[in-house]
Amino acid sequence: MNRYFSIPAGLAALLLASVAAPAGQSAPSVESACGQLTCDIETLFEAGLADGDVAQPVGGGVPGLNFFDAALTLARETGNSAAEARALNHMGAAYRRVGRYPQALERHRRAIAIAPSPQIKGESLNGLGQVHTSFGRISEAVAAHQQALELFTQANLSTGMADTWLYLAAAYEEDRQWDTALTAYETSLEQAEGDAGRQAAALHGMGDIHLEQDRLKAAVASYQSALERWRDVGDDKGIQTTLTRLGGAYHLQRQYDMALTAYKDALAISRTRSDLASEATLLQNMGISHGRSGDWDPALVKLYEAAALFEELGYRALEGETLSQIGNILKAQGNQELAIALYKQAIGVFEDVRQDLRVLPLEQRSVFPRTFAETYRTLADLLLQQDRVIEAQAILDLLKVQEVDDFLDDVPQTAAPDLGTAPLRPAETQLLELYDQTVAEGRELAQLRRIPRSQRSPSQQQRIAALVSAQQTKTAEFNDFIARPEVSTLVAQLGDTSRQQNLNLRNLNSLQDNLQTLNNAVLVYPLILEDRLELVVVSPYSPPLHRTVEVTENELQAALETARQALNNRHRDARPAMEQLYNYLVKPIEADLAQANAQTIVYSPDGPLRYVPLGALYDGDQWLIERFQVTNITAASLTDFNAVPNPNPSILAAAFSEGEYNLQVGTRQVSLAGLPYAKVEVTTLVDKFADATQLLNDAFDRPTTIPQMDDYSIVHLATHAEFVAGQPEESFILLGDGDRVSLRDMSTWSLRNVDLVVLSACQTGLGGTLGNGEEILGFGYQIQRAGAKSAIASLWSVDDGGTQALMTTFYDNLRQGQGKGNALRQAQIALITEDRQVLETNQRGFAQEFSGPLPNLPNTYSHPYYWSSFILIGNSL
């Protein structure tokens, strides 16, 4: 997916010859399509494809399904198994386009089972593969398409081979295997020799790959070649789609006039096709190109129109995105107060309809950067610039949840928490009401355009014409709006920061009460911005405050990568690198921590800060964990700070200690061997608890482990786990039998009775380049969402006995009545100070479990490599 521009993206739809309804006409019913009591199957197929040719409003059912269902019935009545399989495939494609993947899979599998010929079976397998691609199951998609390719090759069906290579390319593209995808598109192009439509689809796909890899000239050339072929076959939908992509390529080359020309031509086609969703997308793109070229007024006009259309169609996530883009332009114009109001309105949409993107038709998936979180980040930045710290803290809390939602993407959010929205101040509410009045005509135009042209009354046609001509005056109207006295008064009120303390005080008071119960805790929210670092501090007894640190995002990123390398190398002195980070993250708030008499830091790290444990920062004399207890949180609003743990803890301890498994994880081949120290770890833990169950290796499987986790207050998993940036299914916990549980799978866990989940051999930040830590955030979020109060995870896997030393001490502290946060801190301090009792206990544990020579254990575990990897997420009691 391209990072910048929204387009109808389904290449498969470009390939299939769909019969569009005549411009301006509504989709026919089965009766009107047939014109008689009986109807031939091909007519029903054509009518169904026409019905689904353009994206429908949200909640409008499954376009084309009634026609395909009628065709299925007719095929069965006439004993036509080929038509029956084709009808099932059409139904599967219709379900896929609206995101109903289980229903789509079921139809394609039924088609495969009854397919009477290699051609139809291959088509059915390709349909199945497309659903897997849409669902992110790339290996399954590739397997299905390769089976189809074998069938088409054996039958010497060149069109089937060309289609299949196109679908394979789309799967590889979804998996970001750019070179493999490009090769597949090129192969499809060769196979489609003499077929201009199929060649156009392949060339369009090649342009997408070039665009993703910033080969902009090559992208333009591919799109132009595709356009020639679309025009040769008269495919308006293909022309519209490729023009939209071509506009995106021109935009990235900063050739904004050419981009706007391409968008304008595509817009004209979308209007003749009554494709309102594409029309809204193109208006949005035009607004962005106008904005990038500094043409603020036409940019605002186009974005207002796009927002109105998205709202009318029910695509509320895209509506919110467009409102955010309007906020960007207002911010660039210096209208910060109005920009803040628009950002808050956008966030209100995002929070209200968090699942919207997942139910959009596949062709309408935006290829904009799907980073709704950037709106939260920009709003927090503006609020902090105006010292509106209470509001900024609330937005930062929402930011964490939006970031994890962006990462988890299509993980079911059936139990998503209600965190509220960005609270509007009275003046902002009034501003938005005035704004709504100003842009109301855009909404009216959107409503009228939803009426098919053949069904519009003369008065409606006249009203549309009047509204279109009035678009030229909208700029002046909005400028007049900005200058209105009542607007100026409201903006002045918003500039009075002395009033902001009255906002959202109930939530602040509740948060401060929680901090008081946590041993004088202080909540710290860092916010990484391009030109600086902001530290937001909430203490129990004073208003929130923020401190600005003059360090750029690039400088901080470099310092974090250096720190992570130092922490991972036990033979390197980590103190200089960790002191540099201390100077950025803690030194600016030292006085604030002292004034609050802080003993605990509740930490909500931002972006790559998630890869470096706060407790490992060094002040020149001590590690931070020696001074403060540190607890990480996903978001304050998701954390039950006061939940008291079970006074009679029970433990389920599982380990993978023997064997080796080779796994395909995304594009990586991973070989993972049993952890020789893991058996010692869990055996020692089981001996410490009266109510304990141990699962080793093959017994540590999915059917045995997951159902009984909620029967224990502590779940301890001593096995490989990798949390990596990318797709949620690429982050996983390895089970003892070689199976694995992904972050996606964890959404179904139930852990309501669990106080603590421990993963003692996690790895993050693999590959040496730090991402934004969304996978770490995602793990904490999923565990809390499943009901567990807290989790302990390692940021890197520690071998040679260090984990066992720390875990044994941690559980000893826990059994003595210490809270989870303090128990972990004291265990870490024991390793820092080289507590002899800890080392001797660790040696004895290995002596009891190893019948042969003892492993060569270190003489000291004082390096932060051994003790700082483990972070506590959530409740610390």
Give the role of each language-model region.
Residues F45-P57, A83-R97, I120-S134, T159-E174, ...:
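Conserved alpha-helical positions within TPR/SEL1-like repeat arrays
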Residues F68, A75, Y95, I112-A115, ...:
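Eukaryotic all-alpha helical interaction scaffolds
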Residues E337-Q622, F641-F656, E660-Y661, G666, ...:
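Amphipathic alpha-helical protein-protein interaction segments
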Residues T803-L877:
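An often Trp-containing, charged/polar helix-loop segment at the C-terminal end
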Residues N504, P540-P544, D606-I714, I733-G736, ...:
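Catalytic-core domains of enzymes
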Residues S637, S713-T809:
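Catalytic cores of nucleophile-dependent amide-cleaving enzymes
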